[in-house]
């Protein structure tokens, strides 16, 4: 009973929800064998023909290349591309590619030389002698990708499966209308396909290998059964024709009864799926040593006179293939890359064939029908009934139209396979698939921006953390350097600080020399000043013999004598037994220098200007004022009360001054006035000003 149940389950197939049955339109192209197309004069090979990043260029403009020569290097998910024929690289530049908007992508442009020479090919006929890793690396470096439409790198897919794969499924359903590339390939190359399947099974080591094919391909089924007649490791499952039974999740459910979870992959349930065209490319890469440089493309539609399936070199312009098929375009001719439900119209025909190009449909106007106006959704739920992914297309439509990305994501818009079944059954002619494609593109753009922002935030936070660590390390170093010394070192440090403070205090105090202290130079300084005063008095008393001066000035002599006598008395008092007040030698030196400079200046001015007439009365008054100021300075300069003035000396001095004044008046009245000595007058005035300033400074010092 258990064996009977196992046998029943072995051949059992399941069904999936939804699906439609559109006209197949396959007989236009599946009746003729595969044929070759003449080489195009120029090939455009986009660097990115797969899911993932483009490879690194390894050719330059002007290089000569051979068929099968690598144009890029593949690392990780970067799949290399190869030259489709021999020729010369004439440009490496952006070119419009197979995209609904014909976006420009970096491409290598090759001018064919017509020789179509291959590189040296090295096949592994005994592939079982090579390791799993070596086989995967060879498949990857030979540019094999999923040829069923997704374009995922086959080597990466095999590497990611690992030991989790229990079921290998070969997708031979080819459910979309018009497309017969896989059907014709199975009819003409069934043995090579089965050999490629065995290579995949050798790499994955699954428990079972299943081939799923729709029952509308009787010739292909017959060819596969003939090849698999003696095989027990591969099972052929014929399934009912229903669109989209060729979808990966749908075919998995049909053959195994398992459903791929939302947001998951088929490998999560132990299933890995490959297309029959991919299996054929694996065989050519491993056994024949040929990179993928061509694929089968269906040329169909009522606008071509020779529909069929051809071996199209990758990079061949679409226009070249259609012209070979007898393309007769109408006024508003449309050319669709892919099928009528999942394909997209080409903006122009200069785009190249790539690895995921399986069909070029050129329908007539009557074949496609007139475009109908889009109307409002009537919420009939026909789209939900037809959806094979169990989604709610009408809700996704509202979310997409309203830019409600969060709600669209919550309703699993990412699980939409864009099969077009919802748009096919919509009575309002709403292009639902276009809305869903745009919404998924916007969500992907938002996620990419969020990823970039998160990476930038992570970099910023890492930098901040690094700066904080460096700051903490600096603080720790400073703290360790500022550790208090031991107790035995405290006394030495305190003594050193005391010495430093004492030196600073001594440096800030003015240098003052007290009388009687050692060394005491006050007496010497006073004697020197007295001698200088006596010399000046004698010089003033005896006129200088000069040819330009006729005689002395009695008024000036009187003034200078009085000043000299006052200074002499001051010097006597300072040189006496009483202690003298402190003398600041720096101030004395400064004042003496100022006096000498002013005297020299006055002499220079007196020598250049004419002397003014001298008034004897004014001279007497000035002499008296000078004597009074001198006595006042003596009183202020002393630290004790001023000594009493000798009246006799004062009387004598006054009498002498009066006599000199009368004599000068008489001489001035009886004889013509002689010209005054300008130099002596200037010197006397300078001395008077200096002494007055000195007295004022001394008074300020005493007050302080």
Curated annotation (Swiss-Prot):
Pfam families: Complex1_51K, Fer4_7, RnfC_N, SLBB. Its cofactor is [4Fe-4S] cluster. Gene3D superfamilies: 3.30.70.20, NADH-ubiquinone oxidoreductase 51kDa subunit (3.40.50.11540). It comes from the Bacteria. Residues 534-682 are annotated as: Disordered. It is an enzyme of class 7 (translocase). Its EC number is 7.-.-.-. [4Fe-4S] cluster 1 binds at residues 377, 380, 383, 426. Keywords: 4Fe-4S, Cell inner membrane, Cell membrane, Electron transport, Iron, Iron-sulfur, Membrane, Metal-binding, Repeat, Translocase, Transport. InterPro entries: 4Fe4S_Fe-S-bd, 4Fe4S_Fe_S_CS, Ion_transpt_RnfC/RsxC, Nuo51_FMN-bd, Nuo51_FMN-bd_sf, RnfC_N, Soluble_ligand-bd. It is a peripheral membrane protein. Part of a membrane-bound complex that couples electron transfer with translocation of ions across the membrane. Required to maintain the reduced state of SoxR. Belongs to the 4Fe4S bacterial-type ferredoxin family. RnfC subfamily. This is Ion-translocating oxidoreductase complex subunit C. The gene is rsxC.
